[in-house]
Amino acid sequence: VFYMDNSFPESWKKYIKAGEEEWKDTFERIGFKNAIVAKDFPVNDPEFDPDNVKFSCVRYSPSQVANAMGPSWTDPRTGEILNASVYLYHNLIQLVHDWRFLQTSPADPDARKVILDEDVLGNCIRYVVSHEVGHCLALMHNMSGSAAIPTDSLRSPSFTQTYGTTYSIMDYARNNYIAQPGDKERGVKLTPPKLGLYDYFTIQWLYTPLLDAKSSKDEVPTLSRWITEKSGNPVYRYGKQQISSRLDPSSVEEDLGDDPVKAAGYGIQNLKYELAHLSEWVKDTD
């Protein structure tokens, strides 16, 4: 259970809940129904304390920080997750607005606003919460999530409606800056997926009960076989986040597709379009 802070703006709450519970389906596929449930902070319950490690929460922080985080605390003896909470700082809304505006406004009139409509902003919040819940479930960043996608497939309605912008929500692949003016009308999806194929596989690997195994060592052959079965498929590749040196060009932040030069070309075209139209988009705002 993730308990949702009652300090959140009311308009955010259904999107936060959706982001939390998106991971339900990954667990249902391995036999756990309602493994993740979102609830409001209990009212008039003397046993509830959001600062108690017994309760995993989604907390609101009225801060100028434009970010979110999803830390967890584990038992070092077993790896059991004892507590996993998501923290959303208020200025997160500025961050997701800027992503949505800069990355998709050429293709999406709904993004050409100083203040995004509730559903557009809400779905940005949903994406962030889902990403942070992934961290709570022990998934690290996978910066190769989009590297297996042919760049031009990100302008395909059928492909993007199925897969979004990346094969893993744990990637830093935000919105579809490959899409060009007119692509939304053709059906191209401009936002990240709910969850990707990599995410489903990782939950399977981490949490599937291997009932015949009598010890953790007995699980190794099955877990190794699952990895071997996927090892030749770049869709399931894990790309470690590179903190200092960027030695692997297929595992970097904020990129899209398998061809960074072509992707950058599309992105630059969009930036030029924005510069040419920015004044008319914001002329009626303060």
Residues covered by each model-derived region:
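Active-site-adjacent "gating/activation" loops or surface patches in catalytic cores
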Residues: V1, V58-N67, P71-I115
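Fold-level signature of zinc-dependent metallopeptidase catalytic domains
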Residues: V1-D45, D49, L88
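Short, flexible loop/turn elements at secondary-structure junctions
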Residues: N6-F8, D40-P42, P62-Q64, T78, ...
